[in-house]
A protein has these predicted regions:
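A short acidic-Thr-Gly-centered motif at the start of a beta-strand
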Residues: 45-48, 159-161, 289-293
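Core RecA-like ATPase module of SF1/SF2 helicases and allied nucleic-acid translocases
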Residues: 120-123, 170-319
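Conserved interdomain hinge at the start of the Helicase C-terminal
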Residues: 149-164
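Short loop/turn elements that form and flank the Walker-type P-loop nucleotide-binding site
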Residues: 49-51, 77-78, 162-163
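Accessory N-terminal region flanking or inserted into the helicase ATPase core
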Residues: 1-56, 65-70, 93
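Conserved helicase motor core of SF1/SF2 NTP-dependent helicases
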Residues: 54, 61-147, 167-182, 191-200, ...
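Ser/Thr-centered flexible coil motifs
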Residues: 13-14, 64, 219, 274
């Protein structure tokens, strides 16, 4: 509620917010629950701050009001505190970040004036945009020596993703599905941030199958993954159930005792893998993609990727 009054741009009616807060508090009381803000409040009200020589606070522009109260409490018994952040990177106001507290901090201020990441042309564009933001700390800093480039495209189809590592960023999660569809149309190897792509999982099973065919004994856990990608035409499920779960098995033993019926190439043997995935994996291998590694291309929301970096970044400007 306090943040509501401080945030003039709130899109929710105060009456609705009060109902939500009341119902949430009732739910927590009825079920004996506390949440993270409750933990902070309890420590601020009755906790004992430790005596510390120094404290370090990072990404301070993203702290909420209650988190700032926690910092102040800990500072009471600390000899020194170092607080780092950048108000120009404050993109979590929607999540309660109170940037004004960071901007108005008292104490000695040091600006890191040399970027190790940002090339010259992206630097110029970023500074042109950030100057439109009101209530910020003016700061002078320099880009690295590389010139870099800034290009404008009408759509993702115009972007050449064939080389290098990429981030493709959008404002909201609902936009990512459409981005993924376009990357699929372009037959590219990509992933959603923090998610392992399906084709990578399948490719790992393909590699295990190839090892098995070469005579390499595999542990039950790997055998189970291979069997899961075969229909009963290629592996008898009843005989598979008799396998001892802690053992290692070669292909001859699996055929003799445990129901394996084939030594075909992976695209025939792993007949539970869909035709679309088979086509995509073959296409990616032919194009030179290394499916043993994570994809060169990641898609994410702008908020979800904060702190990451790539040599190529595409920003979708749709809202």
């Amino acid at each position: 509620i306090k943040f509501y009054h401080l945030n003039n741009n709130s899109k929710i009616q105060l009456s609705k917010l009060e109902i939500i807060v009341e119902e949430l508090e009732n739910y927590k009381k009825q079920n004996g629950l506390i949440d993270f803000p409750d933990m902070l409040d309890k420590f601020i009200e009755s906790g004992e701050a430790p005596s510390l020589r120094v404290i370090f606070i990072d990404e301070a522009q993203d702290l909420s009001l209650v988190q700032w109260r926690l910092v102040k409490k800990i500072e009471e018994k600390a000899q020194d505190s170092y607080i780092s952040g950048d108000d120009d990177q404050a993109i979590y106001r929607w999540n309660g970040a109170h940037v004004s507290t960071f901007i108005n901090l008292e104490g000695e201020r040091t600006v890191l004036d040399q970027s190790q990441r940002v090339p010259q042309k992206p630097f110029a564009l970023a500074n042109k945009i950030i100057k439109k933001v009101r209530n910020r700390v003016e700061k002078k800093w320099l880009p690295k020596k590389e010139e870099g480039s800034v290009r404008y495209c009408n759509n993702l189809h115009e972007v050449d993703f064939s080389h290098g590592r990429w981030l493709v960023l959008a404002q909201a999660n609902y936009m990512l599905a459409g981005i993924g569809n376009i990357l699929d149309e372009k037959e590219l190897y990509w992933q959603r941030r923090h998610a392992v792509p399906r084709v990578k999982n399948i490719y790992e099973i393909i590699q295990k199958w190839n090892d098995l065919k070469k005579g390499v004994p595999l542990h039950y856990n790997d055998i189970k993954k291979i069997a899961a990608k075969m229909t009963k035409d290629n592996w008898d499920p009843k005989l598979f159930k008799t396998i001892i779960k802690d053992g290692f098995y070669d292909i001859d033993t699996l055929k003799e005792k445990y129901g394996l019926k084939t030594e075909a190439e992976w695209d025939e043997a792993l007949d539970e893998v869909g035709d679309e995935d088979i086509y995509k994996i073959k296409k990616l291998i032919k194009s030179g993609e290394n499916l043993d590694k994570n994809p060169r291309i990641s898609i994410s929301t702008i908020h979800g990727v904060k702190g990451n970096e790539r040599e190529n970044v595409v920003v979708i400007t749709d809202l």
